[in-house]
Amino acid sequence: MENFQKVEKIGEGTYGVVYKARNRETGEIVALKKIRLDTETEGVPSTAIREISLLKELNHPNIVKLLDVIHTENKLYLVFEFLNQDLKKFMDGSNISGISLALVKSYLFQLLQGLAFCHSHRVLHRDLKPQNLLINSDGAIKLADFGLARAFGVPVRTFTHEVVTLWYRAPEILLGCKFYSTAVDIWSLGCIFAEMITRRALFPGDSEIDQLFRIFRTLGTPDEVSWPGVTTMPDYKSTFPKWIRQDFSKVVPPLDEDGRDLLAQMLQYDSNKRISAKVALTHPFFRDVSRPTPHLI
């Protein structure tokens, strides 16, 4: 660790503190994530080390690069490339008119490229949210924390006891499904797509049942027709209130027909019918995709 000089604390992630740091030898600025594990006494599980080491192979322009893994005594530090802002801060700080459609389209296209790459390597994210999508002034957006959920699990609370957000969690996870697929990341990205357009979280639930009911109120309560097999899921209840599906023109009014069609395919209840990242990249919505640059604060 003596190779790195901490410059400042930049945040508290799901697993531990994140610092901006400087590599003393090269002068390179990096993000240093200190992973806090419950197993402080036993040291770092070897399975976690193996999982994390595999992530060093994930090289893609839309994936935040894991540069190094430093394992000392019972602590684990992950060294990542540094980007100056996350999408949540950018959305919170952008002017009243919000993010331009051209920039939303560019960001969504890049994120789908990153997802398609990871999914082709059988790596899931499982915890996508605006806070772990990082941007720079060149107009790039990158997925951070890929694969950490598999290595460390997704905790209910962070190490500082903050509740881990449910807002972007796919309905199959909320209904207790133990075996899920790359489709969970597409759902999360669909929620983020809508949020970039409207500047409001699509399903801001404050408990698992509130989260489900917010989804049901918008997309309609699922049944065996809209989602074959839903009634056999562990946490499905036949007593769920029956809501009808809302028209997407009311849910995301600024979006054109192509955008609404893509969003509807990303928010399909049945994960087998949910669009894949690879197919989404060919959607007509991206016919005129360009690469504008954001005005970062």
Curated annotation (Swiss-Prot):
Protein kinase domain mapped to chain residues: 4-286
Example GO BP: cell division
Cysteine disulfide partners in this protein: none
EC number: 2.7.11.22
Catalytic reaction equation(s): L-seryl-[protein] + ATP = O-phospho-L-seryl-[protein] + ADP + H(+); L-threonyl-[protein] + ATP = O-phospho-L-threonyl-[protein] + ADP + H(+)
CDD domains from the UniProt entry: STKc_CDK2_3 (cd07860)
GO MF annotation terms: ATP binding; cyclin binding; cyclin-dependent protein kinase activity; cyclin-dependent protein serine/threonine kinase activity; protein serine kinase activity
Assembly, per entry: Interacts with spdya.
Similarity comment: Belongs to the protein kinase superfamily. CMGC Ser/Thr protein kinase family. CDC2/CDKX subfamily.
Protein name: Cyclin-dependent kinase 2
Species the sequence originates in: Xenopus laevis (African clawed frog)
